[in-house]
Regions:
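Mid-chain, well-packed structural core segment of small domains
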Residues: 100-105, 109-117, 126, 130
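Active-site-proximal, substrate-binding regions of enzyme catalytic domains
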Residues: 2-94, 101, 109-112, 135, ...
Length: 164
C-alpha cells in the first residue's frame, strides 16, 4: 500500500503487540496528524507509546500538523484524532487505518478507503510477515482490552485460514 493515514486505535494496538514493524513493512508511507501522535504518546509508560515515538523520530512515521478539521469536526461521535485523521485522509486522498465503527462508517460515506488493524494482520499473513493472526487478536482483546466482537474475530480467522 502506498500512502496511508492512521488513527490512533489500530496504531496503538499494532505497536503494543510488537507489530508496528509489520505495519511499516506493508505501507510505503504512514502519516499521522499531530493530535493522533499526542493520543499515542500521551502516556509513555503504556505499551507501544515509545515505539510510535521512536518511529516518528526516525522518520518511519510522518507526523504532520493538524489539518483544518472541516466537516468531520461537527460529527459528535468522532474524537479529535479520528476527525483530524479523516480530514487528512481527504486532503492527501489516501485510505485511512481506523478501527472505530463510526469512523469507518463516516470514511466510507465520504469515499475514503478504509483498512483496519485486522485487515493489516490479514495482509501481513498473506505476505508472510506473520505466521498466525489469532494470537495477536487474542493479545489485543486480553492485554489491551481492544473491542473486537466474536463474530469479527471468527470472520478474520476464517479469512486467515485459521478457522473453518
Amino acid at each position: 500500500m502506498k500512502l496511508v493515514v492512521a488513527d490512533s486505535g489500530p496504531l496503538i494496538a499494532l505497536a503494543s503487540s510488537g507489530h508496528l514493524d509489520v505495519l511499516l513493512a506493508i505501507v510505503d508511507e504512514l502519516v499521522i496528524p499531530e493530535t493522533v501522535f499526542q493520543e499515542c504518546t500521551a502516556n509513555m509508560g503504556k505499551p507501544g507509546a515509545s515505539d510510535i515515538r521512536d518511529a516518528v523520530v526516525a522518520g518511519r512515521i510522518k507526523k504532520v500538523a493538524d489539518p483544518i478539521v472541516g466537516v468531520f469536526g461537527s460529527i459528535e461521535d468522532l474524537d479529535a484524532g479520528e476527525a483530524l485523521a479523516l480530514s487528512l485522509a481527504t486532503i492527501v486522498q489516501s485510505p485511512i487505518l481506523i478501527d472505530d465503527a463510526i469512523g469507518r462508517e463516516v470514511a466510507r460515506a465520504h469515499n475514503i478507503g478504509v483498512i483496519g488493524g485486522c485487515g493489516i494482520l490479514l495482509l501481513a499473513k498473506k505476505q508472510g510477515l506473520i505466521s498466525k493472526v489469532e494470537p495477536i487478536l487474542q493479545s489485543w482483546k486480553d492485554g489491551l482490552g481492544y473491542r473486537l466482537s466474536d463474530s469479527l474475530v471468527a470472520q478474520v480467522l476464517m479469512k486467515a485460514g485459521e478457522r473453518k
